[in-house]
Amino acid sequence: VTLPEADRPSWLFWILMGPCASGWLVAYGLAIYRAKLDKRVGIPVFVVEVNLAWEFTLSLILDQADVQRPINLSWFLVDCFILRQTLAYGWKDYPGMSRRAFRWMVFGVIAWSAVFHIMTTYELKDATGIYTGTGLNVFLSLSFIFMLNRRGSSLGQSMYVALAKGIGSFFAGWTVLVMYPGHHLFIFLFLTVWTIDATYCVLLYRKVREEGRSPWAWNRGPTEVPDAPGGLATGSAPRHGEREHEEAAVRSAASG
């Protein structure tokens, strides 16, 4: 269903779209920085694949407004850079899969998602991608929680990414609701996104505090040594049993 946009002043659109784009740009930039620091992807693997396919089809395949296509293309190029990091570090989230199989999975999901998006666009006559984009946002928000739970640590993540992503999604929701008022599905979906984003912020904050670190430390080191067995934290204090073992070894050496 192609939705007609509501009659609204252009300045209102840009007041909402500006913080939306800025929030997402900051989130992507900080996620890239965090991934380089921790050697783990800052954006969930499946989100990178599906989102890249979405931007690719909107930029280069599907019909778009002249003003919208360059914007979509810019985001597609950013996604390509994140894809590089995904191929370099993303396999670490799938220890039972070889790196070759992981690469096949990545490009397979991208191809499938692109075909799905094209077919959905024509089936629903969703020329602007508003339905698929809103649905993708729900999936994206959930994926951050799944990533945190899967790793069991804050590795590759930061409160600044979580907050920037939340701000971007908040203003994205209001942009859609202003452009297409009265559509209850959009209201439901964005209320879902905002709730999930807030939940992720709380869970991540608690996890970083649990690791004995400040959630707001800008240059906090990796929470664990990448690829290290057992995922011990870098610079973390030894556990109680380990400390007793070390003290016993010192006493034994001294008495010998």
PLM features per residue range, with description:
Residues 1-256:
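Alpha-helical membrane-protein topology signature
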